[in-house]
């Protein structure tokens, strides 16, 4: 019977998932960060990515609802606050809607989630279901894509500033804030997984959970590319390039 890898080897195995599969390598992101997206494509990305953003606190609430460890609950609930903010201000969702406004979309239209691609919905709901139903260790492991997020946020900020007129401080506030928030979340989540994946079976399951999450992120961009880049076939119910545009 094979033994579990030591912490260093196991962490390296987790990080290798991101090196091979994280969505910073997707052609759509390379196009976006390189200034090669039209405003229709940028807006379609903002609309569809909002659906993912809006479901993250719901995913985390589902996680907390079955978490019996108060220490874990105390650490995890900050994630909901990071995305939802306070009663009147703050939070990643509000900051994403500022981006929507900056690219010329009605924030109320974006928040309605009308026009979100079916492929986006299926991928995001699969993630929420995964976190709601899978063992706690796997649910935490699926969040470890945040290990790879700071680099993509930094590249995105630089690329948007260089190539797009809308990229002001207000528009980029979401990404700048995540540069501060994500490392804190990663530190806790990674330590939790390294501490609790104490058998090879649990390590394999953790790697599979992280791989699943990279598939969730990648498949959203596949749906977006198919609809708005090539072949450019917008499916029924997908944003038509006009609705909700205010400038």
Curated annotation (Swiss-Prot):
Q: Which GO terms describe its biological process?
A: pyrroloquinoline quinone biosynthetic process; sulfur compound metabolic process
Q: Which reaction does it catalyse?
A: 6-(2-amino-2-carboxyethyl)-7,8-dioxo-1,2,3,4,7,8-hexahydroquinoline-2,4-dicarboxylate + 3 O2 = pyrroloquinoline quinone + 2 H2O2 + 2 H2O + H(+)
Keyword set, alphabetical order: Oxidoreductase, PQQ biosynthesis
Q: Where are the transmembrane segments?
A: none
- Look up the EC number in the record and give it: 1.3.3.11
Task: Give the source's domain of life in one word.
Answer: Bacteria
Q: Which Gene3D superfamilies does this entry report, sorted A to Z?
A: Heme oxygenase-like
Keyword Oxidoreductase included in the entry's annotation: yes
Q: In which pathway does it act?
A: Cofactor biosynthesis; pyrroloquinoline quinone biosynthesis
Record's keyword annotation contains Oxidoreductase = yes
Report the GO molecular function annotations. pyrroloquinoline-quinone synthase activity
What PANTHER family does the record point to? 4-AMINOBENZOATE SYNTHASE, PQQC-LIKE PROTEIN
- Family as reported in the entry's similarity comment: Belongs to the PqqC family.
What does the UniProt record say this protein does?
Ring cyclization and eight-electron oxidation of 3a-(2-amino-2-carboxyethyl)-4,5-dioxo-4,5,6,7,8,9-hexahydroquinoline-7,9-dicarboxylic-acid to PQQ.
Name the UniProt record assigns to this protein = Pyrroloquinoline-quinone synthase
Phylogenetic placement of the source organism: Bacteria, Pseudomonadati, Pseudomonadota, Alphaproteobacteria, Hyphomicrobiales
**Name of the gene:** pqqC
């Amino acid at each position: 019977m094979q033994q579990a890898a030591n912490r260093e080897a196991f962490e390296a195995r987790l990080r290798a998932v991101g090196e091979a599969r994280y969505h910073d390598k997707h052609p759509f992101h390379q196009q976006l960060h390189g200034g090669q997206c039209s405003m229709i494509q940028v807006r379609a990305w903002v609309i569809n990515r909002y659906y993912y953003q809006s479901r993250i606190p719901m995913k985390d609430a589902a996680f907390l609802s079955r978490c019996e460890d108060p220490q874990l609950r105390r650490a995890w609930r900050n994630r909901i606050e990071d995305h939802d903010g306070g009663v009147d201000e703050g939070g990643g969702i509000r900051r994403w809607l500022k981006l929507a406004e900056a690219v010329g979309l009605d924030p109320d239209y974006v928040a309605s989630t009308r026009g979100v691609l079916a492929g986006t919905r299926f991928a995001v709901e699969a993630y929420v279901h995964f976190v709601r139903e899978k063992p706690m260790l796997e649910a935490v492991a699926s969040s470890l894509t945040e290990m790879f997020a700071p680099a993509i946020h930094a590249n995105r900020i630089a690329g948007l500033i260089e190539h797009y007129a809308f990229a002001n401080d207000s528009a980029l506030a979401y990404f700048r804030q995540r540069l501060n928030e994500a490392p804190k979340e990663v530190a806790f989540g990674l330590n939790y997984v390294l501490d609790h994946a104490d058998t090879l079976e649990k390590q394999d399951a953790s790697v599979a959970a992280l791989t699943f999450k990279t598939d969730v992120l990648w498949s959203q961009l596949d749906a977006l590319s198919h609809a708005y880049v090539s072949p450019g076939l917008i499916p029924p119910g997908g944003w038509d390039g006009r609705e909700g545009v205010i400038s």
